[in-house]
Amino acid sequence: MKKISNSLNQKIKKFIQIIFKLIYGNINHDIKKISSEKIKISETKILKKISNEGYKVCEISKGRIYTDFVENVAVIEKHTILEPFSYQTYDGKYLPYSENTCVKKGTPRIKKYFKGNILNLTQGASGHSNYFHWLFDILPKIKIFSELHDLSSIDYFYLDNLKPYQKNILKLMGLENINIISANKHRHIQADKIFATEHPWYFKGLILEEVNNMPDWIIEWLNEKFLKFANNFNAGENIYIDRSESSFKHCQFKNENEISRFLLNKGFVKYKVGNLSFEDQIFLFNNAKVIFGAHGAAFANLIFCKKDTKVIEVKPEYHPNKISKKIAKINKLDLSLIETKELQNKENGDIELDINILNNLL
């Protein structure tokens, strides 16, 4: 019965896709079909990729955007997907733009037209609420755009509905008056003008590996832009980042109670960083002398640390993300990265840390 139900659902989806293709047309990836009259592409001169090339920013008259809100975003001129400005991944791996879902399935959502100018900032699930990707993916797109265009010309950001911390950060940037179009509610949009930038650092391969090639300017700009907003409070100088608040099960200590008792006896103060305001997080990391914790989004705040801050980060050896090394190199931090063996039973955590190793590093 379940197989019949799944088969029926697939047939219904196929039928819906056919109907929407009749309405909005097929999507191709043939750049020869792009109208040079409706699209303008400019390139940054100061901000550079890791390859030392500038970033491209496009401006499309009557352009469209389609997203599945998970792994695909298509920036479209008439019926052609634009390669550098679209985004498509599968299982954490970047795909050729010819494999964007809209090339195969079309744009099976009712199109909503917006009068005015839209800057596309959405890139799928990773950019919706994750603190790290908000700082290192979404905000740099705004910076890239602002090198070539005036932000006051933008009427809308195309994103998901903002979390409180995201609203706060945009307010700190003086961008609180720009309207937000929910990419979840409006999966298919068109506007008088669509603007889109290339991704700040992800152009190929696995995202957890490519993050290690992030250009220096992103880290330096975030520090310069936001450090001044640090909110002074009675924070400990030796801090333990508690990840138990995270909805993710990876990078969690199996022997959390043992580690916690050991560190509290050493004078550490435990913080659930996600419960702090952005301004408090800035101060917490800038004020710290020693930081310990399991790998997670909170370590994005290393961008605010002072030179020579001692950082001890722990992660499973199979986890490839080493962005902390990049930040530590630029900010001249004293980073110790502990990589633990894979556990057979990860039900109550995937990291078991030998206290003796930690004690030797403190």
Predicted regions and their residues:
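The feature primarily captures lumenal catalytic ectodomains
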Residues: M1-L362
